[in-house]
Structures are given as structure tokens and as C-alpha cells.
Amino acid sequence: MHAALVRLTVDPDQAPAAAEALMNDILPRVRSAPGFVAGYWLEPVDGQGFSIVLFETEEQARETAPPVSSWAAPGIVISGVEFRRVAATA
């Protein structure tokens, strides 16, 4: 299993519109992606947000993660994406 770790900044003035885009556009697309296992979007603090999305393979994670998938939401800027193999789960 592999994780896509996404760092982003959120414009607080556009947070409600960003949350709506997440729920109505991004989540459905990610859930239906090949190899999707689970996803977690953490509430932003001081304009900084994170998501952790798990896939069966690294290739599937790379094909779905931004900017390849064109994740777009008002007031959101993707500041970085890393891919890691999941070492353990509990």
C-alpha cells in the first residue's frame, strides 16, 4: 500500500467554497480512482492543510494525486506532494 501526502494552503476567505468543492467534486473522483483504499483530509490550521490518501500501488497514487488529477478548489494551492510506502497499519 502507498500513500500520497498532499500539503496545501487554504485561503480562509474561500474556505466554505473549498469545502464544498472537496465534498462534491474531489472526494467522489478520488473514491472512484483505481486502487483507492482510504483518504483523510485534515482540517486546516493557520491556512495549512494536509491530506493522506492511500492506494494499493505507488503507480495508482501517482496517477491520482495532484497535479496529475487536476484537483482544483477555490482558494486552494497545492504546495507539495510526496509518495511513501505504508510501513505498518493498526
Predicted regions and their residues:
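Short S/T/G/P-rich N-terminal loop/turn motif that feeds into the first structured element of a domain
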Residues: 1-49, 56-67, 76-90
